[in-house]
A protein has these predicted regions:
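A conserved hydrophobic position in a structured secondary element of the catalytic/binding core
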Residues: 49-50, 104, 191, 239
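Short, structured coil segments at secondary-structure junctions
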Residues: 41, 61-62, 149
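Short, acidic/turn-prone active-site loops that include or flank metal/cofactor-
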Residues: 11, 69-75, 232-234
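Short phosphate-binding loop-to-helix
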Residues: 46, 52-114
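Conserved core of the sugar-phosphate nucleotidyltransferase
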Residues: 106-205
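Short, high-confidence coil segments that cap the C-terminus of an alpha-helix
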Residues: 42, 90-91, 119-122, 223
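N-terminal glycine-rich phosphate-binding loop and ensuing alpha1 helix
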Residues: 2-49
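Conserved alpha/beta core of the MobA/IspD/sugar-nucleotide pyrophosphorylase nucleotidyltransferase superfamily
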Residues: 172-255
Length: 255
């Protein structure tokens, strides 16, 4: 199986500006994401960015990077620009590793690429893990996913879905069945180039605009997304200063 990892990275994050260049135990965040991606089975790893600062940092640590337009609506749009510049064939698989996932396990990258390669009838593959506490369930920054019995996505949302009416009473956990836990979406994707090209041709979907979740554009226009349980725990990415501090603590503890 052949696949490419592309890492979209923006400097102007609304919640934590400049986070790709923030230091985590002596390395910038983007270098850590790149290093984790290189441990996967990918043929090539490249950073897609509209920031000269990020571009220069990647070149400095010996990585590959590509400058992109600053007008993209999403990381997927940015990724498609680079895939087009690389002239990758329509059936080639690209894995989108977010630029704020410094602890992304290479096993998760390999898993999502393999899942897509094994399924010709779907255009996108991604991962989930169970949510075991109420705080994460109601957190709008924790994206939830609902799937059908074939492992295909029915819905992605920042809202607490599916709402377990009998398990949660007056905003308190009455009980949560271990066999029916809600699912946290893990923001890693595998696509075929042909699917990426379709994505950028579609207008932004109404639901995508409401939730600010670009994967909803695929579903809005009828593309199927396969969602599998991650074979390994995937730490949450860095959206806030608190997330950054948590990652630093985790790395320090494991030294």
């Amino acid at each position: 199986m052949s696949f490419t990892v592309i890492i979209p990275a923006r400097f102007d994050s609304s919640r934590l500006p400049g986070k790709p260049l923030m230091k985590i135990s002596g390395m910038t965040m983007i270098e850590r994401v790149y290093a984790q991606s290189k441990k996967s089975h990918a043929d090539r790893v490249i950073v897609a960015t509209d920031s000269k600062k990020i571009f220069d940092e990647v070149i400095l640590f010996g990585g590959q990077a590509c400058m992109t337009s600053s007008h993209h609506q999403s990381g997927t749009d940015r990724l498609q620009e680079v895939a087009k510049l690389l002239d990758l064939p329509p059936k080639h698989i690209v894995v989108n590793v977010q630029g704020d996932e410094p602890l992304i396990p290479p096993e998760a990258i390999n898993q999502v690429a393999s899942n897509l390669a094994a399924r010709d009838s779907v255009g996108v593959a991604t991962l989930f893990e169970p949510i075991g506490n109420y705080e994460d369930f109601i957190d709008k920054n924790v994206v939830k996913v609902v799937i059908d019995n074939a492992g295909l996505a029915l819905l992605f949302s920042r809202a607490p879905v599916p709402w377990p009416r009998e398990d949660i009473i007056d905003n308190k956990v009455n009980r949560i069945s271990v066999t029916d836990l809600p699912m946290r979406h893990i923001g890693i994707y595998a696509y075929r180039i042909s699917t990426l090209n379709q994505f950028v041709s579609w207008p932004i979907a109404t639901l995508e605009r409401k939730e600010l979740l670009e994967q909803l554009r695929f579903m809005w226009y009828g593309e199927r997304i396969h969602v599998d349980k991650a074979v390994i725990e995937v730490p949450r990415g860095v959206d806030t200063k608190e997330d950054l501090e948590d990652v630093i603590k985790l790395l320090t503890t494991n030294l």
